Amino acid sequence: MPPMHLLERNKYASALPALKKVSINNLFARSVIENHVRGRVFVDDIARPRAFYVVHPYGMSLLYGDIKDGFLKSELRDYLLGKNGLRETGEFLQVFPSNLEEKIDALLGRSLGTVEENGKPPDPSRPVIKHKRINFRFVPKKYARARKDLNLKAHDFKRIDENMFSNISGSVVPKKFWDGASDFRQKGIGFSLLKNGRIAASSFSSFVHDNMLELGMETEPEFRRKGFASIITAK
């Protein structure tokens, strides 16, 4: 089986021109390629890479470029299936262009499961589950109207410092999107909503590129369903 090749960090720039042609949300992949966070980049050929598989440490991945059947049938297939120790943790994979979807469906065959629209859980015996990612459009005017109704002055906020960076618990937290606290303080920003001196919810920039950013948000379990997510993201 042909191998996938792990690209060295000092060669990540070779993955950027093809990424600029990707029209779906790709800031997480760009963060890896531009060395904002330590991830991995697999390619079809080290000397002249055309196909790229970028893995963000949070577990998001993007397959893009000139994807030939040979690359799909390389170690990439075993990687997707979690075989031979090539992938040890779960990933959320997106592909571009969209016609790759049919090729991957055929590649994985009976190993591919789907999320049932009736709410039934997917078949646990399937190593790969096909799902959908929904992206929302930000409408500044609607946001401004909603923000006025939140009365932010009634709440206690604190900008995320180095100590908080390390101690905020949960799944979507700054330490899973940035290499370190100092890096986050220099290039990102985030706030926590405090209740009785305790962190109830946090919102932060998970990726920042040019004039774009993506927000990450986490609420502590005991403070959920109280509207704190809307409040902290508005801050």
Residue ranges: model-predicted function:
Residues M1-N26, I134-N135, V139-D183:
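Short amphipathic alpha-helix that is part of the acyltransferase structural core
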Residues N10-S14, L27-F28, F71-L76, N99, ...:
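Exposed alpha-helical structural elements
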Residues Y12, V55-G59, F207-V208:
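A short, sequence-level motif marking secondary-structure junctions
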Residues L19-G39:
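Intrinsically disordered, low-complexity, positively charged segments
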Residues I33-P49, S182-F191, L213:
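A short helix-loop-beta-strand connector motif used in the catalytic cores of GNAT acetyltransferases and
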Residues R38-R40, D45-M164:
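Acyl-donor-binding surface of acyltransferase catalytic domains
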Residues G70-L80, L215, R225-K235:
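Conserved acetyl-CoA-binding loop-helix of GNAT-fold acetyltransferases
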Residues A181-P221:
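A conserved beta-strand-loop-helix scaffold within acyl/acetyltransferase catalytic domains
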